Amino acid sequence: MAALSLKGVRKSYDGKQHVLHGIDVEIADGEFIVLVGPSGCGKSTLLRMIAGLESVTDGEIAIGDRVVNTLEPKDRDIAMVFQNYALYPHMTVAQNMGYGLKIRGIERATIDSRVAAAAKILELEPLLARRPRELSGGQRQRVAMGRAIVREPSVFLFDEPLSNLDAKLRVQMRLEIQRLHARLATTSVYVTHDQIEAMTLAQRVIVMNRGYAEQIGAPVDVYEKPATVFVAGFIGSPAMNLMHGRLSEDGASFTVAGGGPALPVAGAPGIGREIATGRDWVLGVRPEHMTPQPGVAQATLPVDSCELLGADNLAHGRWGDHDIAVRLPHADRPARGTALAAALPAHRLHFFDPESGKRAG
């Protein structure tokens, strides 16, 4: 195992197309980090640079006490798990898991021992004699993880490994990856566009956007205190409600742009200090914090639709130019055209600068 250090890491093509813009992060020995963001944000490129599959334009990547910028992938002491499994169809599970060690000249007894140990961890022992065509998608992905485990690397790299699985298998494999990390405690970097994977697997999340690390932090901190409008809108399902508008001079109300209502916001942390009054802001509040509740400031939301999500409902309406969602208990299903008393708890309100997109307060 080893720590992983990224210092000022940049990537560009032909000096013109800039893909990554100075990524700085220190990943502790044994830490599980998730790179999450939309397509084209640079997360997979960064993973490939750590693996040695892409060159580093500028900056430094170090694994343990070695700078690895110019090292070949085979010399970096890493193991990768890919989206497409990449198993040899003519080999058995055991042969697939041990093949990387075989071509490195590792003796047979060591290979057999490592394969047996990994198979036990991943509950693959009954499948060792089977070939990939005889396995389910989840079993194939476990074989791919087993192939990585037997290498006993300093760092695991996961490139969207669950993307090809159905919803039920993704849940199962998330749990297996959590258990695997708890058992092995190997430094891990995991790439995904799926925020549920990011929030459930990570010890820290790196939210990527257009080649920048928008925010780095524990999942709960990123969720509860997003650093930018982008993070607020990307992390969370459904996304945070974000409204452009103007904060009154006395800081008591926020008028939503596009003819929306004046919302009660008095008492929100930072108003009159970091959050200047009498100017434009972007106001954010999560749907689950708008569930009607007694003793909390409220505003009327005309309901135009309601989605049944199983355990709860999601009511939709509009304030001015903005679509608004409110999470409701399973028993509350307002009809179209009804008025919903949406809560606006002061301590749950977020303000962002409309120009920079950065959080205030």
UniProtKB/Swiss-Prot annotation:
A GO molecular function term, named singly, is: ATP hydrolysis activity
Membrane topology, as annotated: Peripheral membrane protein
Q: Name one GO cellular component term.
A: ATP-binding cassette (ABC) transporter complex, substrate-binding subunit-containing
Locate the residues binding ATP.
Answer: G37, P38, S39, G40, C41, G42, K43, S44
Task: State where it is primarily located.
Answer: membrane
Share what the entry says about its subunit structure, partners included: The complex is composed of two ATP-binding proteins (UgpC), two transmembrane proteins (UgpA and UgpE) and a solute-binding protein (UgpB).
Q: What is this protein called?
A: sn-glycerol-3-phosphate import ATP-binding protein UgpC
What organism does the record attribute this protein to?
Burkholderia cenocepacia (strain HI2424)
Gene designation: ugpC
